[in-house]
């Protein structure tokens, strides 16, 4: 009798669990802010497990023990600038187009959505082989005759990322199906766990090879290892993306195999290429201008490889200020189904949470804690600490400037997003030219030793020009009869006031770290890890968010 009773209890519990799971799935599929927010919060929890150790390795271990050469990072970024313009032109805007259409059909017609994935995969694999062939021939026959002759092997190794070249589609597909938790897991694991491990391992291998072969040298060997590590990281990320997408497709009666089967037709290919062709000039202008700026830097900026390497470290730390939510899919789903008020709600919530993250969570660590810590433990990269402050201004302007373009792309106005980027890139190119040109402009007024400060601020004018035009278009073209009503007070002022109590705590933390680090470096690093956890988790939970609510951050007006 007891056995029968226990079996009934177990069956009842299983039934309740199944009902609960179905209810959770039903609520999750409802349109709203909970999906972007849930994805972000899920991602934020991963910081402690994966990203925090990655930050410590990149900011402490790498510059002190693994790759104490800012020049190696500079050479890598120069190579990237030369090749990315070609990569993006060959991609033909398919990433943007795929995310737009996958998001539209993911819930209503998943089999149609997977056809866009299939087209992206086959297009990328075929064009990737063409790119590898052409650029390899260029690198072997022409590049040695130029000032970039030292970078021949950098080009030959890095071009391999274009085959199979499909890693991006799995991130796009997960976002399109609004599986932001899986997309965030993929992003964090690849960019902070796998990337660190592969980069460290291959940098050591490259340095060893350079020492064994003096004609190459340790610096060039480290650079080569760094680039190889990036490629291996992409291959591992590709396998992870395939695994996550396969799990996402199962509830729809689909598998990863369906993504590799040629299921698209001429009409779909034409639709995607037409949309991508309208979006592509926007992104292409960025990479083309970045390429021209790289030419200016290598020609006019003394010691460019070191400065570019330091710039990369500083901009990576400042990049936390631009943390946003994946908004293309929810905005596309709401606006293209004639739910404008929902679209406006999503826009307002994005602003509020951007303010919470940028000003509340990251402003104090980025501007106060990171520079002081980097100065102490950064080794050859310590000089990047002074770059953080001028880079803060363009980093803070980036989101308001870019968000208008994201809205236009999601709401089927890609040509306006393209024009916004033309405005930004035109202003950007002119600004860098006026800053770096040795014959006239700012350099003559401030001197060569001070022009670096203006170089660090050179992105800001383009963001400002793009932002003014972008929000004018969003209002005029998309919401002419609706009030956008950006929550200025809740976005900027309340997060700033809410984080002020953290300042004395951070100053005290830095003082304790310096004292302990001087006595015992290992114990100092442990203290640093505890401080980072406090700033990223404890202070927001027990100081920032209660203060945000107390000051009226969640009030409707």
Regions found by a protein language model. Give the residues of each.
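Interfacial segments at transmembrane-helix termini and the short loops linking adjacent helices
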Residues: 140-157, 366-398, 445-450, 480-481, ...
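Interhelical loop/hinge segments that connect adjacent transmembrane helices in multipass membrane
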Residues: 18, 22-33, 209-229, 238-286, ...
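Transmembrane helical elements of multi-pass membrane transporters/channels
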Residues: 39-62, 225-249, 262-329, 333, ...
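Membrane-interface helix-loop junctions in multi-pass transport and translocation proteins
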Residues: 178-182, 192-243, 415, 425-468, ...
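Interfacial/gating helices of multi-pass transporter permease domains
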Residues: 35-36, 58-85, 151-152, 216-227, ...
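Signature of the first transmembrane helix
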Residues: 2-96, 132, 136, 158-161, ...
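Specific pore-lining/lateral-gate transmembrane helices of multi-pass inner-membrane transport
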Residues: 104-120, 310-419
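Membrane-proximal transmembrane or re-entrant/amphipathic helices at the cytosolic face
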Residues: 1-24, 251-258, 507-557
């Amino acid at each position: 009798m007891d056995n029968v009773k226990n079996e009934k209890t177990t069956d009842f519990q299983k039934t309740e669990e199944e009902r609960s799971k179905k209810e959770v799935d039903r609520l999750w599929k409802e349109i709203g802010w909970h999906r972007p927010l849930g994805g972000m919060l899920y991602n934020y929890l991963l910081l402690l497990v994966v990203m925090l150790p990655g930050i410590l390795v990149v900011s402490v271990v790498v510059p002190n023990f693994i790759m104490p050469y800012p020049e190696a990072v500079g050479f890598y970024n120069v190579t990237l600038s030369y090749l990315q313009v070609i990569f993006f032109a060959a991609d033909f805007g398919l990433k943007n187009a795929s995310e737009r259409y996958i998001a539209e059909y993911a819930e209503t017609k998943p089999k149609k959505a997977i056809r866009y994935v299939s087209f992206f995969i086959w297009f990328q694999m075929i064009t990737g082989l063409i790119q590898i062939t052409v650029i390899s021939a260029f690198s072997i026959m022409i590049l040695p005759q130029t000032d970039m002759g030292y970078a021949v092997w950098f080009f030959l190794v890095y071009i391999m990322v274009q085959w199979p070249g499909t890693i991006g589609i799995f991130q796009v597909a997960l976002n399109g199906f609004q599986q932001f938790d899986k997309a965030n897991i993929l992003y964090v694991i690849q960019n902070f766990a796998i990337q660190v491990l592969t980069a460290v391992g291959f940098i050591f291998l490259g340095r060893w090879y350079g020492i064994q072969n003096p004609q190459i040298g340790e610096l060039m060997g480290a650079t080569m290892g760094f680039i190889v590590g990036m490629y291996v990281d992409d291959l591992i990320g590709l396998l992870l993306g395939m695994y996550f997408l396969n799990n996402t497709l199962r509830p729809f009666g689909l598998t990863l195999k369906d993504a590799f089967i040629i299921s698209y037709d001429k009409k779909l290919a034409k639709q995607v290429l037409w949309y991508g062709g309208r979006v592509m000039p926007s992104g292409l202008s960025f990479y083309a201008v970045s390429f021209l700026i790289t030419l200016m830097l290598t020609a006019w900026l003394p010691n460019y490889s070191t400065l570019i390497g330091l710039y990369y470290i500083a901009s990576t730390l400042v990049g936390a200020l631009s943390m946003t939510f994946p908004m293309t899919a929810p905005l596309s789903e709401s606006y293209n189904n004639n739910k404008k008020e929902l679209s406006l709600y999503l826009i307002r919530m994005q602003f509020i949470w951007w303010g919470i993250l940028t000003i509340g969570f990251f402003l104090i660590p980025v501007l106060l804690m990171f520079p002081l810590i980097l100065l102490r433990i950064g080794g050859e990269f310590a000089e990047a600490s002074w770059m953080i402050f001028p880079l803060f201004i363009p980093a803070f302007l980036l989101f308001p400037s870019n968000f208008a373009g994201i809205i236009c792309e999601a709401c089927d106005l890609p040509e306006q997003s393209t024009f916004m980027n033309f405005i930004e890139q035109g202003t950007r190119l002119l600004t860098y030219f006026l800053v770096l040109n040795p014959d006239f402009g700012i350099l003559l007024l401030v001197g060569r030793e001070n022009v670096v400060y203006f170089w660090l601020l050179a992105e800001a004018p383009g963001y400002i020009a793009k932002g003014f035009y972008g929000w004018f278009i969003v209002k005029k073209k998309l919401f002419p009869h609706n009030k956008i009503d950006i929550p200025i007070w809740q976005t900027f002022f309340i997060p700033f006031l809410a984080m002020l109590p953290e300042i004395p705590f951070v100053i005290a933390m830095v003082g304790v770290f310096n004292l302990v680090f001087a006595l015992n470096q290992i114990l100092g690093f442990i203290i640093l890890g505890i401080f980072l956890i406090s700033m990223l988790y404890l202070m927001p939970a027990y100081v920032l968010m209660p203060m945000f609510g107390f000051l009226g951050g969640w009030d409707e007006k």
